[in-house]
Amino acid sequence: DVEAGFIEFRDLLGHCRFRDCRHDREPGCALLKALDEGRIQPQRMASYRHILASLPEPEY
């Protein structure tokens, strides 16, 4: 998981309202709340999103 590579995300993972939270726009997202509160730097969230965007879409 990409999230595990971001140290400041680790304590927040598993605390989102939805188990399949993508940490993008979902209500109840612990990462977005931490971003709004200044506990996650905007540059780090931008890096996380950039990495996710560069990954291929999963095939089901």
UniProtKB/Swiss-Prot annotation:
Superkingdom of the source species: Bacteria
Gene3D superfamilies membership: Probable gtpase engc, domain 3
Family the entry assigns: To E.coli YjeQ and H.influenzae HI_1714.
Name used for this protein in its record: Uncharacterized protein in rhdA 5'region
Native organism: Azotobacter vinelandii
